[in-house]
Structure formats: structure tokens, C-alpha cells
Design a protein with these regions (language model features):
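Active-site microenvironment of metallo-dependent hydrolases
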Residues: 1-286
Length: 286
């Protein structure tokens, strides 16, 4: 409406908003009215006010003059949304990081920000394995692919959570929303990951015991319970991680962005550590 009011030809304005946009983003079956394209159409009264008269979806009239067609029913299959956490068979060995290197890359949290630092820290080696060092606030992190059964597990280390004797896990991890786990020992990391299979959500584990769990059964992202239930469970999760010594107000917020490998500097995906500035997978060893 604004473009036409400013003098742009109506046909060109419609092309820019439909066909040009579809072509730009590679939507091959959308953007124009042609054979073999999706019959998703909007019928306007005129080319000035653009008041919508009819809406067609997949060749069916679904709304007229702003009113939904009473016969229009959802064809969505919600079963997959309630069955979205599919973890591989996990053991403590799944979280093992072999190595004898002196220096490793560590993700450094910056409180209140989504960006991270790339820290180079001295590795703690025990029996040929690189392990967490909670006394120096260097915890182990894992990102486990949960959608397609790839068995991918990315492993790394992170500094800034500052808790001991436990692990946290979440299925909220932008943008792929895999299972992200942080802990100071492999046993608790295993329990935390298994706790989220298949209900998803967020949890806190210590000494093999689940201290708190907020289930998020819808795609691992949302709850089907009343808001009061969600608030109580979320508060219990936060209280539990604070008991373990974490000073962050809500550690699940930075955790949810650590797998997001488009925000600098160092992130962890299910394929491994990502140097976002270089857009490359990088090794743990420096």
C-alpha cells in the first residue's frame, strides 16, 4: 500500500513482494500463478486499498472477507512435535575427550552478552583424557544431535558457569535445538542428557540425582501444562543450579546460545567447536 501510494506501479509492487522475494529465497513453487505451483492465493478488492476478499491455501478457499471458512480444518501432523528428542545410546564414554595437549580452546562466557571469547587454557589431563577443572571454572560441554539420528556429539569446554559437583542440560539451544549439556563430570552429564530423553526441557543433576527438571514435551521447546506449572518448575531448576554454586541469574539463557554458531566468537555445535569469525570447525587443541 505504501509503495503504491508513493507512486510505484501496482503490478511491479506485487511482483516485488511475491515473485521477486520467492525467487531470491529459492522458493521454486511459490511467488506467481502458474501450472505446477502451489495454489496459495489472495484475492483483493482493488489495487489501491488491497482489502483482502478471499484467501486460498493449496487450492482451497479458507477465508472470505476476513472470516475463516468453517470447513477449514488443520492438516498438520502434531505427532512429530511430541516426539522430537531422539538421542543415541549414551554412556560416560560418549563424553570422553582424549588428548594430551597442553593448551585447549575454551569458550569464555561474557555475562549479559551472547558473544563469547576464545580462551586458551592449560588442559587438565587425567589418564590420557582431557577433563573438566571445576576449581578453575573450566567445565565440559557437549552438544548432542537429537533430530535425525546422526549420533553426532560435539565436545568442548566452557568457562563462566562456575558450578561444581553436577551438570545441567537443555533442549533449548538455538537454532538447531539439540541437547546441550555442561558439567564437571561425565557421570552427571550422562544422567542430565538421559533425563531429557524423550521429554526434553531443562534439568539439573548432582551426584547422579536429578535435582530439578522442567519438561518441555512439545518439540523440546514448549510445555503443554498451565503457566503456573512451568513457572514453578523453572524456579526449581534455577534454585537447584544456584545451590551448586552458579552465580548467573539464569544460566540456561547463555547455555541456549552457546550452540548458535553465527554469533562470535567460539561456539559448539554437534560437529565440534566453531570459530564463527572464520566460519570453520576448529580443533580443541591450540
Amino acid at each position: 500500500r505504501k509503495a503504491i501510494a508513493l507512486g510505484l506501479d501496482p503490478i511491479l509492487a506485487i511482483c516485488i513482494a511475491t515473485k521477486h522475494a520467492a525467487d531470491h529465497y529459492g522458493f521454486q513453487r511459490r511467488g506467481s500463478i502458474e501450472p505446477n505451483l502451489l495454489a496459495n492465493l489472495i484475492v483483493f478488492d482493488d489495487l489501491n486499498n488491497f482489502r483482502v476478499r478471499q484467501t486460498w491455501y493449496h487450492g482451497k478457499l479458507v477465508a472470505t472477507n476476513g472470516v475463516m471458512n468453517a470447513l477449514c480444518t488443520s492438516e498438520l501432523d502434531w505427532s512429530t512435535a511430541n516426539d522430537s528428542v531422539h538421542l543415541p545410546k549414551l554412556t560416560e564414554q560418549s563424553f570422553c575427550v582424549k588428548g594430551k595437549t597442553e593448551l585447549i580452546r575454551v569458550i569464555g562466557l561474557i555475562e549479559g552478552q551472547l558473544i563469547t571469547e576464545e580462551l586458551h587454557e592449560r588442559a587438565k589431563i587425567e589418564q590420557g583424557k582431557c577433563v573438566a577443572d571445576a576449581n578453575r571454572d573450566i567445565l565440559k560441554m557437549a552438544v548432542i544431535e537429537r533430530h535425525h539420528g546422526t549420533n553426532n556429539i560435539g565436545l568442548g569446554f566452557v568457562k563462566g558457569f562456575s558450578f561444581q559437583h553436577g551438570a545441567i542440560a537443555s533442549t533449548v539451544g538455538h537454532d538447531a535445538h539439540n541437547v546441550a549439556v555442561v558439567g564437571d563430570n561425565d557421570a552427571d552429564m550422562l544422567v542430565a542428557a538421559q533425563t531429557l530423553n524423550p521429554q526434553g526441557g531443562q534439568c539439573v543433576v548432582s551426584d547422579g540425582r536429578v535435582l530439578a527438571h522442567l519438561p518441555l514435551p512439545i518439540a523440546g521447546l514448549m510445555s503443554d501444562e498451565p503457566s503456573e506449572f512451568v513457572i514453578d518448575k523453572q524456579q526449581a531448576v534455577l534454585e537447584a543450579i544456584h545451590i551448586l554454586g552458579c552465580p548467573l541469574d539464569d544460566p540456561f539463557m547463555p547455555l541456549s546460545f552457546l550452540p548458535l554458531s553465527v554469533i562470535p566468537k567460539l561456539k559448539l555445535s554437534d560437529l565440534g567447536l566453531v570459530d564463527v569469525e572464520q566460519f570453520q570447525i576448529v580443533p580443541l587443541e591450540v
